[in-house]
């Protein structure tokens, strides 16, 4: 009985450790410049574990350099090994070469830019550049965005290899995050057909009130297929990224996506 239970226990421990890493990864680097990182209590609340269990797991992550702890504030952040693994991953699929393109688009538009792939029914952010603006909207690398309530998610659905109707059906119940969220499968399906036709998606407060965005597909290199692996997006506060401004940025976003296409990225 003991030997049979061990693998299950090991899997649970790994899942819990990954949950902690995700929480730390989703914490903006400038969330609290004077006290960066998260306290143990905050992490435990986010992963729905007791502080003692969280501490036991996080000590292992610290020992393996996936997490670091500030000796003064005792707050936790991602460690150097997490950075090494992230860079290895980006390099393995060619994403390091995307960074200059994202930076140019960020500088041109004044807003944060990001690249996402379809992963586990989410739009998984694999690269990003932060705006220099004090008030901005960031999608941190590693973050998973709702497909139906994000611009990049809607692009990935609209150009899905399985077709829009099937892709929407597989989403199941659509969570309504704000009054602007499209939570009806019928409405979402119709909207995604429009997105596929116009080749861009807008988001006006569909995930967070006051946060808008525009995204376009990154077409596959050397293929006639319109089924895509990547979506490129620009995000910002609604005070700057108005509907008119988003439409003005579509051409710049499309041009940047074409440059990324020419890189011939591997499948993430």
Predicted regions mapped to residue ranges:
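Extended hydrophobic
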Residues: 180-257
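Short amphipathic alpha-helical signal-transduction/dimerization elements
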Residues: 25, 153, 157, 161, ...
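Amphipathic alpha-helical effector-binding/dimerization core
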Residues: 72-73, 77-172
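A structural signal for short hydrophobic beta-strand segments in well-ordered beta-sheet cores
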Residues: 67-69, 115-116, 218
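N-terminal helix-turn-helix
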Residues: 2-92, 258, 262-263
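Charge-rich, low-complexity intrinsically disordered segments
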Residues: 5-8, 244-268
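Short, structured helix-loop boundary elements
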Residues: 10-14, 75, 79, 95, ...
């Amino acid at each position: 009985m003991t030997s049979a239970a061990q693998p299950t226990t090991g899997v649970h421990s790994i899942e819990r450790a990954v949950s902690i890493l995700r929480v730390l990864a989703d914490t903006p680097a400038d969330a609290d410049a004077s006290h960066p990182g998260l306290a143990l209590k905050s992490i435990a609340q986010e992963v729905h574990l007791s502080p003692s269990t969280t501490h036991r797991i996080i000590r292992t992550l610290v020992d393996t350099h996936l997490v670091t702890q500030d000796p003064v504030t005792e707050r936790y952040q991602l460690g150097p090994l997490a950075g090494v693994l992230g860079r290895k991953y980006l390099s393995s699929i060619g994403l390091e070469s995307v960074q200059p393109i994202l930076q140019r688009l960020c500088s041109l538009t004044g807003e944060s830019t990001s690249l996402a792939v379809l992963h586990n029914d989410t739009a998984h952010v694999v690269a990003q550049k932060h705006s220099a603006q004090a008030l901005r909207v960031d999608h941190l690398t590693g973050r998973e965005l709702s497909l139906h309530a994000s611009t990049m998610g809607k692009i990935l659905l609209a150009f899905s290899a399985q077709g829009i109707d099937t892709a929407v059906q597989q989403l199941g119940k659509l969570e309504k995050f704000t009054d602007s969220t499209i939570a009806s499968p019928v409405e979402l399906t119709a909207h995604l057909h429009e997105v596929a036709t116009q080749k861009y998606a807008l988001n006006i407060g569909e995930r967070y009130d006051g946060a808008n965005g525009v995204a376009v597909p990154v077409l596959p290199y050397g293929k006639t297929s319109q089924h895509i692996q990547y979506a490129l997006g620009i995000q910002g506060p609604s005070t700057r990224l108005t509907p008119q401004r988003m439409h003005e940025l579509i051409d710049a976003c499309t041009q940047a996506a074409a440059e990324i296409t020419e890189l011939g990225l591997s499948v993430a």
